[in-house]
UniProtKB/Swiss-Prot annotation:
GO terms of molecular function: nucleotide binding
Family (UniProt): Belongs to the YajQ family.
Chain segments annotated as coiled-coil in the UniProt record: none
Species of the source: Maridesulfovibrio salexigens (strain ATCC 14822 / DSM 2638 / NCIMB 8403 / VKM B-1763)
Protein name per Swiss-Prot or TrEMBL: Nucleotide-binding protein Desal_2385
A UniProt-annotated Pfam family: DUF520
Length: 163
């Protein structure tokens, strides 16, 4: 029986490249002259910590990150911006989490969406992915279109298509 997996993955190298490009742009921008701005990527915890001078600079860096992530073909919906907190050195700090893997709630929403479509396919949750199996390849392609059109606010990839 044909099947495929719905996953949410991030290319770690592209994330690293995007963060480095943002740092290069910050070095060349006039409005960041004389302002200490730090961006640290922690690959183990999948977080980016951002420390800069004021609220306007945080917004500018956020816009730069979204632009560079889009340029590097990493979906900006995989960025989860935390709240802005003041630091002891009169600067502002923001934690950005990289969403990777499908959590249980989102997986349940996907399965519910697929079952509500009345297509003759089965969806099963496997750790941080959803496996969809069906008799017809056309039904599987309909499921891909259905999930792509849904507003689940998360980037999905469709892998392991088996016939």
């Amino acid at each position: 029986m044909p099947s495929f997996d719905i996953v949410s993955q991030i290319d770690a190298q592209e994330v690293d490249n995007a963060v480095n490009n943002v740092l290069k742009e910050i070095d060349t921008r006039y409005d960041f002259r004389g302002v200490n701005t730090e961006i640290d990527l922690n690959k183990k915890t999948n977080t980016i910590s951002l420390v800069t001078g004021d609220e306007m600079k945080i917004k500018a860096v956020k816009d730069m990150m979204i632009t560079h992530f889009t340029r590097r073909k990493v979906d900006p919906r995989s960025l989860d911006f935390g709240k802005v907190e003041p630091t002891s050195s009169a600067q502002l700090k923001q934690e950005i989490k990289l969403k990777e893997g499908i959590d249980k709630d989102t997986a349940k929403k996907i399965v519910k969406l697929i079952k509500a479509s009345k297509l003759k396919v089965q969806a099963a949750i496997q750790d941080d992915q959803v496996r969809v199996t069906g008799k017809k390849l056309d039904d599987l392609q309909s499921v891909i279109a259905l999930v792509r059109d849904s507003d689940l606010d998360m980037p999905f990839q469709y892998v392991n298509m088996k016939k």
